[in-house]
Regions:
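Active-site-adjacent mobile loop/cap segments within catalytic or ligand-binding domains
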Residues: 66, 70-122
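Mid-sequence, gly/pro-rich, charge-dense loop/helix-turn segments that line enzyme active sites
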Residues: 1-62, 68
Length: 123
C-alpha cells in the first residue's frame, strides 16, 4: 500500500549501511534540531483520494529511522519557516522487483501512477 508519513524523527538508527557504507546508530540527524517534524502535506486527504482511485493506502505514523526518515527530516528542517509544503510518501516495490526482494510488498506501476495523480489532484 501507499503510505504518506506523518512524522520525521531526528534520529538515525540503522542496522544497515547507507550507500556510502556508513552505519549510523542512535545519532541525531541535525544536532540540536527538534525531536520531530510533522508533514506539511494533507496526508489524510491523500489517503482518501488514493483509496478513492482504487489503490490501497494508509497514513503511517513514522518513516522509521533509516534513509527515508533521514530524507524526510532534512527536507522538513530545510523548509521550516517557508510556505513550501513537504513530506514523504512511501511506495512499495514495483511488481517486477519481487524476485530481487522476496517477501517485500509490491504494486504495479499503473497503481502507483494512479496514487500519485490522486495526491496531485488534492494539492
Amino acid at each position: 500500500q501507499i503510505t504518506p508519513e506523518r512524522i520525521a524523527i531526528n534520529l538515525d538508527d540503522a542496522r544497515l549501511a547507507d550507500n556510502e557504507g556508513v552505519i549510523r546508530n542512535d545519532v541525531p540527524i541535525v544536532v540540536g534540531g527538534p525531536v520531530a517534524y510533522e508533514s506539511t502535506l494533507p496526508i489524510k486527504e491523500f489517503v482518501t483520494a488514493i483509496n478513492g482511485a482504487g489503490v490501497p493506502a494508509a497514513v503511517s505514523l513514522s518513516a522509521g529511522a533509516f534513509m527515508c526518515n533521514h530524507i524526510f527530516y532534512v527536507a522538513q528542517d530545510r523548509l521550516k519557516g517557508t510556505t513550501v509544503r513537504s513530506g514523504f510518501v512511501h511506495v512499495p516495490l514495483m511488481d517486477e522487483q519481487a524476485g530481487e526482494f522476496p517477501g517485500l510488498p509490491t504494486m504495479s506501476l499503473d497503481q502507483m501512477v494512479k496514487a500519485v495523480r490522486a495526491m496531485l489532484e488534492v494539492l
